[in-house]
Design a protein with these regions (language model features):
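Noncatalytic scaffold domains of N-terminal-nucleophile
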Residues: 1-18, 22, 30-209, 215, ...
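Extended C-terminal subregions enriched in glycine
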Residues: 320, 324, 358, 404, ...
Length: 532
């Protein structure tokens, strides 16, 4: 457990957490720390975060004001003819299961991350942007060491990161020579120290020139030569993409009211529609509210069966009703709650949570999808493949609505307990985000687990008719689940497949501490970086 005085941050990489902790120690607020960590994640976690991606930030000010900043991907304003589009299938191998995606420049939607960072800074930041981006510039220029988790990610989706010559040059290193004497290259491995000078230069330029460098000016003309906007427009035009200068120029960060809900003795804030994750979590909690979950021990098979049934009901409601506020209609909830009494029928994201000593809090989830395989020239950053993710674009290559903010499972969340505690959390994990967060919430609120226990407890996830569960479930629970769900997968270890919940809590007395999820190599640091 990490405890801190000025602030606490949990994130998916040591350098990401360190960047935020450094800013907290320098007197920055939670939002400054989150921005610094987000820049660093693009350097240290390039498979999960990129200048070419997007995300969501839940902010809560010490004065009580809360907002969602939506800087997720936007569909292009125009659609090219299918014969012109670069859109190719690829599969990620998690060992015991696979998940399909599509890549190519035609899979890229309008990225929002850079505009979102600047919008958050203008609204909530207290330190100069140059100071916040400084640690990331230094790391990109001086090098970061590849962690085992980052190496594992590359091994899972390696074909994407060697898909183009520019990607191969960036994400591989020389590894001797072949029999003919030609240089041989391999993907980054754990322990490699790698630099990204193009990214360092791009970050430096963004700190000086602002987000217009990435999105272009609002004058309606073509992007100026040498800008990132011009590079993206040219990449898309030449390599089968839909994006053009109008998409970039018109992109805006959207501010929304968080979705608010009550559960037991806690009040929760999470991501509202059009993102789907928060609403589906709210639906699941509303179903659980009619059950005395606290009376079921973690080792009770009935507890796991109830959670699996709630996941199935949520899946069915999403399929039958869509992801709209109608899901929280009391009559609809009663119908699905009654169904729970019946026997059951037979991606890349990362998260940052920060709270400072004044109780300012930020919960940020970002994603680059899996990346489309193409590097934005001059930036050392891969463009997203959001149009190629079936979960948020089920229509595929040419059936998406024009110029629309895309939905997402991402659900940065805050919990306000009646006793004065504040917790911010969120998860990566594509389709598993909502089930990971739901289970951690139940562990915290119903079972009164410590933050570490709640995050590290084994999880289950229902995907279609197949129930997945992690190693560590009591044998009696696993046996009962296997009987109830003939189509199942028992994972031999805790795995990133089940998400990565990084969380920070502020106790009623002001004490700050947090936990990074070991499934995704999570790290938690305080301003003094004093782990105990």
């Amino acid at each position: 457990m990490v405890r801190a005085e000025k602030g606490c941050i949990a994130a998916g990489h040591p350098k990401t957490a360190e960047a935020g902790a450094t800013i907290l120690a320098a007197g920055g607020n939670a939002f400054d720390a989150a921005i610094a960590a987000l820049w660093m994640s693009c350097v240290a976690e390039p498979v999960l975060a990129s200048l070419g991606g997007g995300g969501f930030c839940l902010t809560h000010g010490a004065g009580g004001d809360s907002r969602i900043y939506d800087f997720f991907a936007q569909t292009p304003r125009r659609r090219r003819a299918p014969a012109e589009v670069d859109f190719q299938p690829i599969y990620a191998d998690f060992g015991v299961t696979t998940q399909g995606f599509h890549i190519g420049v035609g899979a890229a939607a309008t990225p929002g991350l850079v505009r979102g960072i600047f919008a958050l800074h203008r609204a909530r930041g207290s330190l100069p942007m140059r100071e916040l981006v400084g640690p990331a510039i230094a790391a990109a220029a001086g090098g970061v060491t590849i962690t085992p988790f980052q190496a594992y990610l590359l091994s899972v989706i390696g074909p994407i990161y060697t898909h183009t010559p520019a990607a191969r040059a960036l994400f591989t290193v020389e590894d001797g020579a072949d029999e003919a004497g030609a240089p041989r290259r391999r993907l980054w491995q754990a322990g490699d120290r790698v630099t990204n000078p193009d990214l360092a230069d791009a970050l430096d330029a963004l700190a000086r020139e602002g987000d217009a460098l990435f999105y272009g000016d609002d004058d309606g003309g073509p992007p100026a030569p040498g800008t990132i906007a011009a590079a993206i427009s040219r990449l898309s035009a030449d390599h089968g993409g839909h994006l053009d200068a109008d998409d970039l120029r018109s992109y805006r960060t959207l501010e929304r009211e968080p979705l608010r809900l009550g559960y037991r003795d806690a009040h929760l804030l999470t991501n509202p529609p059009p993102a789907s994750g928060g609403l589906l979590i709210a639906f699941g909690l509303a179903l659980l509210a009619g059950h005395d979950v606290s009376a079921l021990s973690f080792a009770d098979p009935d507890r796991a069966a109830l959670l699996a049934a709630v996941m199935a009901a949520t899946r069915d409601a999403r399929r039958d009703r869509g992801v709209t506020p109608e899901l929280l209609d009391p009559a609809l909830l009663r119908a699905y709650a009654e169904a729970l009494a019946a026997p059951p029928a037979t991606r890349g994201t990362t998260h940052i949570s920060v709270i400072d000593r004044d109780a300012n809090a930020a919960s940020i989830t970002v994603s680059n999808g899996e990346g489309c395989g193409a590097i934005i020239p001059g930036t050392g950053s891969m463009l997203n493949n959001m149009l190629g993710e079936e979960d948020i674009n089920p229509g595929g290559a040419d059936a998406w609505p024009l110029d629309a903010r895309m939905g997402s499972m991402m659900a940065p969340t805050a919990i306000f307990a009646d006793d004065g505690r504040l917790c911010v959390l969120g998860s990566g994990g594509s389709k598993r985000i909502r089930t990971a967060i739901l289970q951690v919430l139940v562990n915290l609120i119903d079972h009164r687990m410590s933050l570490r226990e709640a995050v590290e407890a084994p999880r289950i996830h229902l995907e279609g008719a197949r129930l997945n569960w992690e190693a560590g479930l009591p044998a009696e629970v696993a046996e009962a689940l296997a009987r109830a769900y003939p189509e199942h997968t028992a994972w031999p270890e805790r795995n990133m497949y089940f998400g990565g919940v990084h969380a920070v809590i502020r106790e009623a007395d002001g004490e700050l501490h947090g936990v990074g999820d070991p499934r995704r190599a999570g790290v938690c640091l305080g301003d003094a970086r004093d782990a105990s």
